[in-house]
Every structure is written in structure tokens, then in C-alpha cells.
């Protein structure tokens, strides 16, 4: 009996040591799921919508707060349709735009809080990271290609205090390269949204084998994963 109890206790210890992502929607700040890497913000253990670090979580278009499984210009929240003088349908931008040729001009380059998926889903101090905060993660951490529970990704280990997070290779959704917007592709790489734009392009932190942490300018209607941060 003593041996059985010992084994059971060991199992409990093992399970409690396994990282989890129980950040509940609207649950506010959850310190046990915010990893202190000694940086300006704390990073979530998992992607938004994931229940373990190796899961991709949900996919979002930039500026949308509801996940989906098909990503096109036609179903993007901030697209508006107008007709040309020839009667053709033109897809224009209704928000986050600086070009009069592409729609309503507001010159916004950073997501409003109500358009931040992490803030909308989690509440509290959770939000999407800025490009500067991701750059800090790149500069002040060591990125090592590894696998966790059979999923490839990067261990991102702080040079400040040696704490770490795992970023899985997620792939993304788009209508490029012959895809229809509903097929997850480029699963050999990770792409995570940031909350601010680079001129007319939205930006993701991009990482794959041989490229541990760099930048990729992309189109806002693409479906990407999100790793929340907490102030």
C-alpha cells in the first residue's frame, strides 16, 4: 500500500509540474500563467485559445476579436464594399488605413483596445504585444529550436533570469499561393501578431528553423495566432 501511495503522490507532482494555460475568458489577471522573463511585460504560457504551450490556439485576423477558420478580404471585419463607376465591386478598408486610395483614412497604426483580441477575450491586464515588446523578447532571450509533446517550436529562454516560454510553430491561413483562406499552411514556421502596424503593413513575429525571431510584413486579413502579454 505504501508503494502505491508513493507512486500516486509522484504522479500528482508530475502533473502539477506540467505547464497549463487556464486563462479563462474574462478572468482578468492570472499571475500563474504570466511568465516573468525579466522584461518590460510578462508573457502568457500559451497562445490565445490554447490549453497547453504546444498548441497553436485560435487564429485571428488582425483587429478582429472573434476566431474563425476562413480568412479572406471578403469576410474581414474592417473591409467595406463599394462600387466603381463601372459597376465593379471594390474592397476597401474601413479602419486602420492611411491611404485615400484604399478606403477611409484614419491614420491609425495601433489597435484600439476594443479591437485587441487578447484584451477582449481575457480582460484584466492581458493584451497583444507591441512590436517593441516582441523585439525585446528577441534581443534579451535565447531562442532554441526544440520540440514539446511532439510539436516543434522554440524554447525562448531569458538572458536575464533564465525563465522560459515555448512558442510552437503554428502556420497561418491566407489566400496566397493558391490557398483559399481555409487551409492552414506553412506549418514549418510560427507567426504571431503584434498590435501595431509598420506603415501600411501589419506585422508578425516570424520564426522557423534557421530564423529564430525576425519580422514579417503581412496582410491584415491573414489568420495568425496570438501570444498575450500582461503589464
Place the predicted regions along the sequence by residue:
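Positively charged n-region of N-terminal signal peptides that target proteins for export
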Residues: 1-4
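Conserved positions within compact, well-structured domain cores
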Residues: 24-231
